[in-house]
Amino acid sequence: MPLQDFLFTSESVTEGHPDKMADQISDAVLDAVLRQDPKGRVACETLLKTGYVMIAGEITTKARIDYPKLARETVRRIGYTSGDMGFDANTCAVLVAVDQQSPDIGQGVDTGGAGDQGMMFGYACDETPELMPAPIQYAHAVTKQLAKARRAGLDLLRPDGKSQVSVEYRDGRPARIDTVVVSTQHAESVSNKRLHEAVREQVIAKALPKRLVDRKTRILINPTGRFVIGGPMGDTGVTGRKIIVDTYGGMGRHGGGAFSGKDPSKVDRSAAYMGRYIAKNVVAAGLAARCEVQVAYAIGVAEPVSVMVDTFGTAKVPEGKIARAVREVFGLTPRAIIEGLDLLRPVYEKTAAYGHFGRTEKTFTWERTDKKDALADAAGLSKIRAVAGV
């Protein structure tokens, strides 16, 4: 029997977190390739440490890419423009080690097959307007507000930061926020009192729903007391190390493959986006309150080897009907996914911070709910509603 009363916690990190810096540089490279060569193949990894960026991977393209310029522009946009912050876009070294994609992989992908084997998951639920789990959505809201406040002139803040939100569920529904943790890099001269006041008033109060925050909600700001050394000086940053932040905050399962730096022929990315698209449309159609979709592929093979739909006991029609409707309504070959979601556009750098899902920007095509009516019809829900007079 599923849990009904519990606490669930998810975390988010800012764009200035070193792992997210790596993700954004990798996706900036991908976008640069797609602008010039939509058929380019990209598998780009980034590593950052004090004073330098390393870009490595396998990239096959006709595009001409200035990697050092691209890396520095990305770091500058994030906000690391002074040695006082521990990293400087203007002076950092950029090392590049890029080869072409193996022709052994290319021969399967070029004919429409999957770029690798693996399983991917998509998830949606009716806890928030974005059909995302509440804990991760609120954690992202806090980190986005941290960055917004910093850019709006709260200059005591620095780019690196994290949030963690614990939501109390009653009868299986979000009832209140139990604990909020914010750790933010800051100027050395700022007092703890001033920092705490600023984060409470200009970040937490603006980011979280007032109806869910009460007198018992615990607010923990920089619990260690000091966070001056941050960014790549404090921690090495590597592409693909924040895969739970990127997805559902642990509420939905994850197949293990990271997203950033990968062109959409890699089903790690494109099929996970399709999984979200399917799950969100299932929930939006009213077929279930929660939905998780798993798809799995073999390298070089176009059709998925399996498709699974789990609604956790919330389905309005038998799950078998939903699964059959999914196969009927959605094309699940890599080519169909790429075409259906228009994935050969340079839109990926925006995905690399604050989550790939639950976003409202129009470029996030996998967040549309334009298939909900077709799904409801295919699964027989429309007939049930008609009989019931709904």
Swiss-Prot record:
Query: Where do the annotations place ATP binding?
Result: 17, 160-162, 226-227, 235, 241-242, 258, 262
Q: Which domain of life is it from?
A: Bacteria
State which pathway it belongs to.
Amino-acid biosynthesis; S-adenosyl-L-methionine biosynthesis; S-adenosyl-L-methionine from L-methionine: step 1/1
List UniProt keywords, sorted A-Z: ATP-binding, Cytoplasm, Magnesium, Metal-binding, Nucleotide-binding, One-carbon metabolism, Potassium, Transferase
Q: Name one GO molecular function term.
A: methionine adenosyltransferase activity
From which organism does this entry originate? Anaeromyxobacter dehalogenans (strain 2CP-C)
Where mainly found? cytoplasm
What gene does this protein come from? metK
Q: What is this protein called?
A: S-adenosylmethionine synthase
EC number of this enzyme: 2.5.1.6
Alphabetical list of PROSITE patterns matching this protein: ADOMET_SYNTHASE_1, ADOMET_SYNTHASE_2
User: Where is the organism placed in the taxonomic lineage, from the top?
Assistant: Bacteria, Pseudomonadati, Myxococcota, Myxococcia, Myxococcales
Which parts of the sequence bind L-methionine?
58, 101, 235, 266
